Swiss-Prot record:
Protein name as it appears in the record: Uridylate kinase
Molecular function terms from GO: ATP binding; UMP kinase activity
Catalytic activity annotation: UMP + ATP = UDP + ADP
Main subcellular location of this protein, as a coarse class: cytoplasm
Function in brief: Catalyzes the reversible phosphorylation of UMP to UDP.
GO biological process: 'de novo' CTP biosynthetic process; UDP biosynthetic process
Family: Belongs to the UMP kinase family.
A cellular component term, taken from the record's GO annotations: cytoplasm
Residue numbers binding UMP: G54, D72, T133, G134, N135, P136, F137, F138, S139, T140
Keyword ATP-binding carried by entry: yes
Protein's organism: Caldanaerobacter subterraneus subsp. tengcongensis (strain DSM 15242 / JCM 11007 / NBRC 100824 / MB4) (Thermoanaerobacter tengcongensis)
Keywords: ATP-binding, Cytoplasm, Kinase, Nucleotide-binding, Pyrimidine biosynthesis, Transferase
Length: 237
Protein backbone atom coordinates (compact mmCIF):
# COMPACT_ATOMS: atom_id res chain seq x y z
CA UNK A 1 0.00 0.00 0.00
CA UNK A 2 1.24 3.48 -0.80
CA UNK A 3 2.37 5.35 2.30
CA UNK A 4 0.59 8.45 3.51
CA UNK A 5 2.21 11.44 5.20
CA UNK A 6 -0.81 12.40 7.29
CA UNK A 7 -2.72 9.80 9.31
CA UNK A 8 -5.42 12.04 10.83
CA UNK A 9 -6.70 15.09 9.00
CA UNK A 10 -9.46 17.66 9.10
CA UNK A 11 -10.82 18.42 5.65
CA UNK A 12 -12.60 21.77 5.43
CA UNK A 13 -15.03 22.12 2.52
CA UNK A 14 -16.88 25.36 1.92
CA UNK A 15 -20.58 25.37 1.24
CA UNK A 16 -19.89 27.21 -2.01
CA UNK A 17 -17.80 24.26 -3.19
CA UNK A 18 -20.83 21.98 -2.81
CA UNK A 19 -22.86 24.30 -5.03
CA UNK A 20 -20.55 23.58 -7.97
CA UNK A 21 -21.37 25.91 -10.85
CA UNK A 22 -24.68 26.86 -9.27
CA UNK A 23 -24.99 29.98 -7.18
CA UNK A 24 -27.18 28.26 -4.62
CA UNK A 25 -28.03 24.81 -3.32
CA UNK A 26 -26.28 21.46 -3.57
CA UNK A 27 -24.82 20.02 -6.77
CA UNK A 28 -24.97 16.28 -6.14
CA UNK A 29 -22.48 15.60 -8.92
CA UNK A 30 -19.97 17.54 -6.81
CA UNK A 31 -21.05 15.82 -3.59
CA UNK A 32 -20.68 12.39 -5.19
CA UNK A 33 -17.24 13.23 -6.60
CA UNK A 34 -16.05 14.46 -3.21
CA UNK A 35 -17.44 11.29 -1.59
CA UNK A 36 -15.52 9.16 -4.12
CA UNK A 37 -12.30 10.99 -3.22
CA UNK A 38 -12.87 10.72 0.51
CA UNK A 39 -13.49 6.98 0.16
CA UNK A 40 -10.18 6.57 -1.68
CA UNK A 41 -8.31 8.41 1.06
CA UNK A 42 -10.12 6.61 3.87
CA UNK A 43 -9.26 3.28 2.21
CA UNK A 44 -5.58 4.24 2.56
CA UNK A 45 -6.06 4.20 6.33
CA UNK A 46 -6.32 7.95 6.81
CA UNK A 47 -8.62 9.10 9.60
CA UNK A 48 -10.83 11.90 8.26
CA UNK A 49 -12.77 14.57 10.08
CA UNK A 50 -14.85 16.80 7.82
CA UNK A 51 -15.97 20.34 8.51
CA UNK A 52 -18.42 21.78 6.02
CA UNK A 53 -19.63 25.34 5.54
CA UNK A 54 -23.13 26.49 4.71
CA UNK A 55 -22.66 29.36 2.28
CA UNK A 56 -24.45 27.54 -0.54
CA UNK A 57 -27.66 27.65 1.49
CA UNK A 58 -27.37 30.70 3.72
CA UNK A 59 -24.97 33.63 3.82
CA UNK A 60 -25.11 35.79 6.92
CA UNK A 61 -23.81 38.83 5.06
CA UNK A 62 -27.01 38.81 3.01
CA UNK A 63 -29.12 39.08 6.16
CA UNK A 64 -29.60 42.85 5.97
CA UNK A 65 -31.16 44.16 9.16
CA UNK A 66 -31.27 40.74 10.80
CA UNK A 67 -29.89 40.10 14.27
CA UNK A 68 -26.37 38.68 13.84
CA UNK A 69 -26.88 35.85 16.30
CA UNK A 70 -30.04 34.70 14.53
CA UNK A 71 -28.33 34.89 11.15
CA UNK A 72 -25.41 32.82 12.44
CA UNK A 73 -27.74 30.20 13.89
CA UNK A 74 -29.37 29.89 10.46
CA UNK A 75 -25.91 29.39 8.99
CA UNK A 76 -25.19 26.62 11.46
CA UNK A 77 -28.35 24.81 10.39
CA UNK A 78 -27.29 25.17 6.75
CA UNK A 79 -24.06 23.30 7.54
CA UNK A 80 -26.11 20.42 8.96
CA UNK A 81 -28.03 20.11 5.68
CA UNK A 82 -24.72 19.87 3.82
CA UNK A 83 -23.35 17.38 6.36
CA UNK A 84 -26.33 15.07 5.88
CA UNK A 85 -25.90 15.21 2.10
CA UNK A 86 -22.24 14.21 2.42
CA UNK A 87 -23.05 11.50 4.96
CA UNK A 88 -25.60 9.96 2.62
CA UNK A 89 -23.18 10.00 -0.33
CA UNK A 90 -20.42 8.40 1.76
CA UNK A 91 -22.68 5.71 3.20
CA UNK A 92 -23.88 4.82 -0.30
CA UNK A 93 -20.22 4.03 -1.01
CA UNK A 94 -19.91 1.80 2.04
CA UNK A 95 -18.05 4.37 4.14
CA UNK A 96 -19.28 4.36 7.76
CA UNK A 97 -19.95 8.00 8.61
CA UNK A 98 -21.12 9.90 11.67
CA UNK A 99 -22.41 13.46 11.79
CA UNK A 100 -21.72 15.29 15.04
CA UNK A 101 -23.34 18.67 15.61
CA UNK A 102 -22.21 21.45 17.92
CA UNK A 103 -25.88 22.18 18.62
CA UNK A 104 -27.84 19.18 19.84
CA UNK A 105 -30.36 17.69 17.39
CA UNK A 106 -30.32 14.06 18.45
CA UNK A 107 -33.07 12.97 16.07
CA UNK A 108 -30.72 13.36 13.10
CA UNK A 109 -27.14 13.45 14.43
CA UNK A 110 -24.93 12.83 17.44
CA UNK A 111 -23.98 15.76 19.66
CA UNK A 112 -20.30 16.66 19.39
CA UNK A 113 -18.38 14.69 22.00
CA UNK A 114 -14.61 14.80 21.57
CA UNK A 115 -13.80 11.34 22.91
CA UNK A 116 -16.57 9.75 20.87
CA UNK A 117 -15.36 11.53 17.73
CA UNK A 118 -11.82 10.23 18.27
CA UNK A 119 -13.16 6.71 18.85
CA UNK A 120 -15.10 6.88 15.58
CA UNK A 121 -11.95 7.95 13.75
CA UNK A 122 -9.92 5.14 15.31
CA UNK A 123 -12.55 2.67 14.07
CA UNK A 124 -12.22 3.95 10.52
CA UNK A 125 -15.38 6.02 10.43
CA UNK A 126 -15.52 9.42 8.78
CA UNK A 127 -16.77 12.08 11.19
CA UNK A 128 -18.53 15.17 9.84
CA UNK A 129 -18.50 18.08 12.27
CA UNK A 130 -21.53 20.30 11.64
CA UNK A 131 -23.12 23.45 13.09
CA UNK A 132 -19.77 25.23 13.31
CA UNK A 133 -18.57 25.78 16.87
CA UNK A 134 -22.16 26.10 18.07
CA UNK A 135 -21.54 29.76 18.82
CA UNK A 136 -22.46 32.86 16.80
CA UNK A 137 -19.67 35.18 15.59
CA UNK A 138 -17.37 32.23 14.81
CA UNK A 139 -16.80 30.99 11.26
CA UNK A 140 -16.73 27.41 10.05
CA UNK A 141 -13.00 27.94 9.38
CA UNK A 142 -12.63 28.56 13.11
CA UNK A 143 -14.66 25.41 13.72
CA UNK A 144 -12.19 23.48 11.54
CA UNK A 145 -9.24 24.85 13.53
CA UNK A 146 -10.95 24.09 16.84
CA UNK A 147 -11.90 20.53 15.92
CA UNK A 148 -8.43 19.88 14.48
CA UNK A 149 -6.88 20.97 17.78
CA UNK A 150 -9.34 18.92 19.83
CA UNK A 151 -8.92 15.66 17.92
CA UNK A 152 -5.13 16.08 17.49
CA UNK A 153 -5.29 16.26 13.70
CA UNK A 154 -1.93 16.54 11.99
CA UNK A 155 -3.08 18.99 9.33
CA UNK A 156 -6.05 20.97 8.05
CA UNK A 157 -6.78 20.44 4.36
CA UNK A 158 -8.46 23.62 3.15
CA UNK A 159 -10.31 22.78 -0.04
CA UNK A 160 -10.80 25.74 -2.38
CA UNK A 161 -11.71 26.49 -5.98
CA UNK A 162 -8.16 27.72 -6.66
CA UNK A 163 -4.89 25.78 -6.42
CA UNK A 164 -3.33 27.63 -3.50
CA UNK A 165 -2.82 31.05 -1.97
CA UNK A 166 -2.06 34.04 -4.19
CA UNK A 167 -1.07 37.63 -3.52
CA UNK A 168 -4.38 38.67 -5.14
CA UNK A 169 -7.43 36.98 -6.59
CA UNK A 170 -6.17 34.78 -9.49
CA UNK A 171 -9.68 34.63 -10.94
CA UNK A 172 -9.61 38.39 -11.43
CA UNK A 173 -5.90 39.10 -11.94
CA UNK A 174 -3.83 37.16 -14.47
CA UNK A 175 -0.59 38.44 -12.91
CA UNK A 176 -1.43 37.01 -9.47
CA UNK A 177 1.55 35.27 -7.87
CA UNK A 178 1.11 31.95 -6.07
CA UNK A 179 2.82 31.29 -2.76
CA UNK A 180 4.34 27.85 -2.20
CA UNK A 181 4.80 28.29 1.53
CA UNK A 182 3.69 30.88 4.07
CA UNK A 183 3.96 31.41 7.80
CA UNK A 184 0.90 32.04 9.94
CA UNK A 185 2.12 35.60 10.51
CA UNK A 186 2.43 36.13 6.74
CA UNK A 187 -1.23 35.22 6.36
CA UNK A 188 -2.29 37.48 9.22
CA UNK A 189 -0.09 40.46 8.36
CA UNK A 190 -0.70 40.41 4.60
CA UNK A 191 -4.42 39.79 4.92
CA UNK A 192 -4.26 36.95 2.40
CA UNK A 193 -7.68 35.59 3.28
CA UNK A 194 -6.65 31.95 3.69
CA UNK A 195 -8.76 31.74 6.84
CA UNK A 196 -10.09 34.45 9.09
CA UNK A 197 -7.73 35.74 11.77
CA UNK A 198 -9.35 33.77 14.61
CA UNK A 199 -9.00 30.48 12.73
CA UNK A 200 -5.42 31.25 11.66
CA UNK A 201 -4.38 32.25 15.18
CA UNK A 202 -5.83 29.03 16.59
CA UNK A 203 -3.76 27.01 14.11
CA UNK A 204 -0.67 29.05 14.95
CA UNK A 205 -1.10 28.57 18.71
CA UNK A 206 -1.51 24.81 18.26
CA UNK A 207 1.07 24.41 15.47
CA UNK A 208 -1.41 22.87 13.04
CA UNK A 209 -0.29 23.28 9.41
CA UNK A 210 -2.84 24.31 6.80
CA UNK A 211 -2.65 23.09 3.20
CA UNK A 212 -4.70 25.09 0.71
CA UNK A 213 -5.43 23.14 -2.47
CA UNK A 214 -7.79 22.91 -5.43
CA UNK A 215 -10.80 20.71 -4.74
CA UNK A 216 -12.06 20.90 -8.32
CA UNK A 217 -9.26 18.63 -9.61
CA UNK A 218 -10.07 14.97 -8.95
CA UNK A 219 -7.46 13.13 -6.91
CA UNK A 220 -6.03 16.16 -5.13
CA UNK A 221 -7.16 15.09 -1.65
CA UNK A 222 -5.24 11.84 -2.07
CA UNK A 223 -2.20 13.70 -3.42
CA UNK A 224 -2.14 16.00 -0.41
CA UNK A 225 -2.30 13.22 2.20
CA UNK A 226 0.47 11.37 0.35
CA UNK A 227 2.69 14.44 0.59
CA UNK A 228 2.63 15.53 -3.03
CA UNK A 229 3.80 19.09 -3.51
CA UNK A 230 0.56 20.78 -4.53
CA UNK A 231 -1.18 23.88 -3.26
CA UNK A 232 0.19 26.18 -0.56
CA UNK A 233 1.25 25.15 2.94
CA UNK A 234 0.87 27.51 5.88
CA UNK A 235 2.99 26.60 8.90
CA UNK A 236 5.46 27.98 11.42
CA UNK A 237 7.92 30.38 9.85
Amino acid sequence: MSSVVYKRVVLKISGEALAGDKEFGIDFNVVNRIADEIKEVRDLGVQIGLVVGGGNIWRGRDAVGMDRTTADHMGMLATVINALALQDALEQRGVPTRVQTAIEMRAIAEPYIRRRAIRHLEKGRVVIFAAGTGNPFFSTDTAASLRAAEIDAEVILLAKKVDGVYDKDPLKHKDAVKFKELSYLDVLNKGLGVMDSTATSLCMDNKIPIIVFDLTTYGNIKKVVMGNDIGTIVKEG
